[in-house]
């Protein structure tokens, strides 16, 4: 253990392996978001632009698998919600609980399941998988943690998992 970084708090240890922040998409999956995303990166794949092609190839219009996290990004403001709304809330919890003022996403891996179709309603939850011993990198001293974000459609089918490796740290001068 580093002199500057305390042991992993029991509060964090108690969270490992437990589903956190279960939520459902605020709207049905729809093509407007898909068209905007594809236009932004100039992806002309007819699978996403041509309904007939999508029907022929996969039986329905679908969203690109890489858009999975888009469906759970909260709007900054929405009626009925109070306080700050952030995606990947468990990441911010780790920073706060472990008193690590800085943090980065140092790695991201995606596992894709069944395609996300137009009209789907998705559910998700976050799971803290692990927290490392104290590490020192070029940016500072802190800990790595891994968070899985698992997502399912309204039929309970797995549509994907995003695995985030995060590094929370203190800069050398902090």
For the regions a language model picked out, list residue spans one by one.
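Hot-dog-fold acyl-thioester-processing enzymes
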Residues: 2-107, 173-174
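HotDog/MaoC-like acyl-thioester-processing domains
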Residues: 1-22, 105-174
């Amino acid at each position: 253990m580093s002199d500057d970084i305390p042991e992993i708090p029991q509060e964090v240890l108690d969270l490992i392996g437990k589903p956190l922040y279960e939520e459902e998409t605020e709207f049905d999956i729809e093509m407007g978001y898909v068209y905007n995303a594809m236009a932004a990166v100039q992806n002309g794949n007819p699978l996403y632009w041509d309904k007939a092609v999508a029907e022929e190839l996969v039986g329905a219009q679908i969203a690109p698998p890489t858009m999975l996290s888009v469906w759970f990004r909260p709007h900054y403001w929405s009626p009925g919600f109070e306080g700050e709304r952030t995606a990947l809330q468990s990441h911010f919890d780790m920073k706060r609980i472990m008193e690590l003022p800085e943090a980065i996403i140092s790695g991201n891996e995606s596992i894709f399941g069944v395609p996300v179709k137009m009209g789907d309603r998705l559910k998700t939850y976050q799971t803290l998988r692990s927290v490392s011993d104290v590490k020192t990198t070029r940016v500072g001293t802190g800990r790595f943690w891994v968070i899985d974000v698992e997502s399912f459609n309204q039929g309970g089918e797995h549509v994907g998992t995003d695995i985030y490796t995060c590094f929370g740290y203190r800069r050398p001068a902090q």
